[in-house]
């Protein structure tokens, strides 16, 4: 077997570097399944705005706390001609180590009993801090709010891409 010539080294080395970099790039922006469950409270500041706070668990985060701002932006058409609410929400989920994940949620809230609303919609990851800096992702939102007791429960299910550098 003969040793590689300078010309062969010049061709093979860049190919090996390109392969290594493509593997690192693929790993750096891999889309992963994401699930989050959260329970907490809702406090209305005005007839159309509220804050939320809760605790729960999320994949890639472990135990979390949540803080959100909710705005009713219009009416939603619900089953049996019930009138519900179209809602926009910004929520921040904080992991035990302090890393944060921020989301924008849009949902339709429809009454299921007096003062109790079921919400379905979508979420988009808008960023974060720590390992969630520059994160992206999206999925579905499902939740229930009992405005009589001021309690909420919600779930997010979708994907997240954590851009590791």
Stretches with model-predicted labels:
Residues 27-165:
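Beta-strand-enriched cores of mature, soluble protein domains
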Residues 13-23:
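Bacterial N-terminal signal peptides
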Residues 2-13:
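Bacterial N-terminal signal peptides that target proteins for export
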Residues 4, 23-26:
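Glycine-centered signal
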């Amino acid at each position: 077997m003969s040793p590689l010539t300078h010309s062969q080294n010049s061709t093979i080395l860049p190919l090996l570097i390109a392969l290594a970099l493509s593997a690192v790039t693929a790993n750096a922006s891999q889309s992963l399944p994401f699930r989050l469950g959260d329970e907490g409270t809702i406090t209305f500041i005005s007839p159309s705005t509220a804050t939320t706070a809760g605790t729960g668990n999320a994949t890639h985060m472990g135990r979390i706390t949540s803080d959100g701002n909710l705005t009713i932006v219009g009416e939603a058409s619900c089953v049996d001609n019930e009138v519900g609410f179209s809602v926009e929400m910004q929520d921040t989920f904080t992991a035990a180590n302090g890393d944060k994940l921020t989301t924008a949620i849009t949902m339709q809230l429809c009454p299921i009993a007096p003062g109790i609303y079921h919400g379905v919609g979508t979420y988009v990851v808008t960023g974060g801090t720590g390992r969630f800096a520059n994160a992206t992702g999206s999925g579905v939102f499902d939740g229930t709010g009992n405005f009589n007791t001021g309690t909420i429960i919600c779930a997010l299910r979708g994907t997240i891409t954590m851009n590791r550098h």
